[in-house]
């Protein structure tokens, strides 16, 4: 398994920390390969416990039947699911150290998670119905008026289920990269955090800003997933 470049001060390997981030941001970019051409699909995935997986986790979801991803030979080798990024540009003007020596340059901060595993296809109506029930429960839970599958006419729902195919990824490895200026001084990191907080125009900028406030130059590998605020480096 060839892993992406991850500086030690940015990488997060604690499974539960990564799982919490994935649960909060379930829309994945699912990258598969047919041996010739890579394919990227946006697919909501639910992370579930699975004792049979190397990490104890699996991702479940579904794709349109018209999507060739699920057909035999369209997903050779490992599949990669990426979650995020929550991101924001970082201006060097936000660093207090700029006024001291000007040895600063722009960068980008972000929160992103990756999961690798073997993709399995489940073209079974009962299995797919179960996945839809779990996804619906996760997405609708906590809403004042949650939608439930039983609210839809049975014949309509049965017809819709014939148009999708279930997928499952047994997760072999899962890690995140939280690039939150943790290698810089506390003053520079907090300066960047405050700069991002004043703009809040990047995707996930508020959450990123919160993460930067939680980070320190000595701790990111087990950094907690933060509240709904966004920010990047």
Positions of predicted regions on the chain:
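Binding-site signature for planar aromatic cofactors or substrates
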Residues: 1-233
